[in-house]
Amino acid sequence: MENRWQVLIVWQIDRQKVKAWNSLVKYHKYMSKKAANWRYRHHYESRNPKVSSAVYIPVAEADIVVTTYWGLMPGEREEHLGHGVSIEWQYKEYKTQIDPETADRMIHLHYFTCFTESAIRKAILGQRVLTKCEYLAGHSQVGTLQFLALKAVVKVKRNKPPLPSVQRLTEDRWNKPWKIRDQLGSHSMNGH
């Protein structure tokens, strides 16, 4: 019998991001209860030795599964060390991979308190409008003029700690140059 290969898209991330992601998920699952029905699977609950953890996020009748891996191919730098994450959408027996932006949008629409375009209609009709959004990155598209006006009126309140974001987990910070503040007293930073 021949070998059967299975290809999986895995975003390479550093170990600290995996720790931060797991910490945020556990905080909002057990402390704030915003993610109370999310399921967290530890590495010892998986049959795959490369799986570090898996978070099952129910969205309607399906699940978004965010799986973190360890012990993958070594990265270009020491901090890469072969950690990665994959994101799947599962409905019964059907599975497909999705990108982090789509996953965040689906999670945002289902879990986070948010004013949406329906808030414009509610405001015009004089009904009560939810005045906050816990995940502003979910509104990355250009909105209507009324929606932008409503966003201008609503005060932004930051959550401490932030809600878990798949997009933030997979963002590529390695290829972006580091921004180091130039301090007058620091000679080692600017080479003088």
From Swiss-Prot:
Induction: Expressed late during infection in a Rev-dependent manner. One of its GO terms (molecular function) is metal ion binding. The keyword 4Fe-4S does not apply. InterPro entries: Vif. Residues 151-164 are annotated as: Multimerization. Residues 171-172 are annotated as: Membrane association. GO terms for cellular component: host cell cytoplasm; host cell plasma membrane; membrane; virion component. Signal peptide: none annotated. It is a peripheral membrane protein. The modification Phosphothreonine is found at T96. Residues 40-44 are annotated as: Interaction with host APOBEC3G. GO terms for biological process: viral life cycle. Residues 14-17, 74-79 are annotated as: Interaction with host APOBEC3F. Homomultimer; in vitro and presumably in vivo. Interacts with viral RNA and Pr55Gag precursor; these interactions mediate Vif incorporation into the virion. Interacts with the viral reverse transcriptase. Forms cullin-5-RING E3 ubiquitin-protein ligase complex (ECS complex) by interacting with host CUL5, RBX2, elongin BC complex (ELOB and ELOC) and CBFB/CBF-beta. Within the ECS complex, Vif interacts directly with host CUL5, ELOC and APOBEC (APOBEC3F and APOBEC3G) substrates. This is Virion infectivity factor. The gene is vif.
